[in-house]
């Protein structure tokens, strides 16, 4: 027999014409529902067709044969939208189809053709997203003979699942995606920077009550500067998620942790956190800024670093509005507009940061 989805067509032994009517299709459909498509190859045409069936062309009942050819495999995959979404669940059309670059004339096209042909309702997907191929660190295709493949299980065992997720999200998948131990090593460093930055914030929120946030008017301008930068990150991440530009999010979060937090804000605010009175207004203000930042980062990065962000979420303090069971059970934070500084004030801070960078560079040079 030929392997594949059978073509439900019969032929009249008398006139030789093909037969495919509503009546024959229903008979085949009922048979498949009961016994599966293999029944087509196991049963004779007379056992499939209704009793007393006659040829719609010549009107005779001289016997019938079945079509032995099968449908192209793309018809199978192109029909999955009906079986998986439209028939039972009612989720048709899909939010997104995701596949490799070669599927424009493959799965995407066959799905479109079957949907339009069967229902006349347009594409079975709202959007389709394509990606390049996974290659080694030098851009070469992976082959066992070359020994340049990377086993995901090895990445799990050496670095954890979040590192593999970070690799997938960090790459611009519109082009070929490089994969090597060196790349995972660099990503592990980025991951540790994110984790250690969040750990620092967690350590300094041990005695903080998130129900008692410092009001914007009582907050030092430096803390409001941080939250304004956080607002920018929220807006960029939200747009990037909507556009499926995950690499923009990973790079933006890394830049925020390295430059905005570690190299600037946290370096300055340590004195307030460590040296001022536990209940001092300026210390509580810094804790408010840290809490809102950590609260946002754990949600914002959870789709990528799922396990790490949930670990952070379980360890941090919460308000009654949070679902403390798991970070993904909560909605993403919106920008904290009440704390935002105006553009003129932010521009002045950019000048301050630029001067600080020059001075720090001169100090490092003098120490050398």
Regions found by a protein language model. Name each.
Residues 10-13, 64, 208-235, 267-368:
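Acidic, turn-prone loop/beta-hairpin segments
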Residues 1-208, 226-269, 273, 288-301:
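Structured secondary-structure scaffolds
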